[in-house]
């Protein structure tokens, strides 16, 4: 049989500016992008409707739910230890792969808990899933520290914003498909069998994410003449005022986000009665599509205009969304308001995340860089994420429940505890955007002027 050659040649997609980079460097940067794409599906399962439905199916209250979803960010404090271990051992690749595989593979037994602990022992079930969550979260902190340290060394500074935008775009596209598949599986396989399957899928895809790093070329960590003690490392970080200003803003901004973030899904699932597929389409796929459209634009804007003005603009625009949630009550307007909030979330918040990540990479010096990243992540996740989740759950089960009993009318329905939580979120978001961020920008400008004299 004669084979005809068409002369057509297929080029691989160019995801970022490869100018001046050798083939090995380009390949490593590409592998990191494809790795996070697999990881995104894992994150969508373990942090989306599957986790919400699974925990609620186990019968947890809003307060306990808030505590459980806070386990992962609360483990951020372990990053200080992880950074110390990394700086002392200098074995970045081994730390990343070992901790990553452990944290991802634990999702398999996590989803199987209802099959080997009977319904007659609900407390044992809760304690066991808490244990799996805690061990997975703690091992993830070693992964995060080594991964962020790798990014700071392997991504050229001139393309840092656009590269992170391209990485986010690819992972988001994959996440859209994964999110829809997860919701579809949960709807056709209801109950604990469906949850066991999707958490097993999370373990598999999360492990694929980590195994790709075997082929990544890890640049050597910077050589230090003397290894600092943990006390000296911490002291160095805590005397950097510009760095601490960034940490303070991102922490309070994160608190305003995560105070109500896990309860949006609870609210529309219980109060509005949407299916898993409908929730995933609206709460994950729709904002992800918007993120794909905007990510490279935000990345390019960060490279062209700088981090501070872009973050300031995003903060002001996104501070409106929680007010719309306040008016989401059972009725004809609820779907339209939910669509608007998730569209704005997808368009704006990824830009803020890229901006914060670029800022922390730029503001952490090469010496003891992983400790800077550890302190940043520890504070922002422990206070801005974990504490916010727990406080949100406590507010819902206590003072806001009392307000709900007043049955204040709104748009033909009565305000419930979730509406009040969304109103508090709106107030905090505006404080962050209009008071704290401008002060941080002003302080940075004063420091820059002083250094230029």
Placement of each model-derived feature along the sequence:
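C-terminal transmembrane helical hairpin of 12-TM major facilitator-type secondary transporters
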Residues: 309-353
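Hydrophobic core of transmembrane alpha-helices in multi-pass small-molecule transporters
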Residues: 37, 106-107, 113, 121-143, ...
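Cytoplasmic membrane-interface "Motif A"-like loop-to-helix N-cap segments
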Residues: 88-105, 166, 191-193, 304-317
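Transmembrane alpha-helix termini and helix-breaking/packing motifs in multi-pass membrane transporters
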Residues: 52-53, 57, 84-88, 111-120, ...
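Helix-loop boundary and gating motifs at the non-cytosolic
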Residues: 2-79, 83-86, 93-97, 103-111, ...
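Helix-to-loop junctions at the C-terminal end of transmembrane segments
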Residues: 78-91, 186-187, 293-307, 396
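C-terminal ends and interior cores of transmembrane alpha-helices
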Residues: 100-122, 187-188, 316-333
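Intracellular loop-helix junctions on the cytosolic face of multi-pass helical membrane proteins
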Residues: 1-30, 114, 120-130, 134, ...
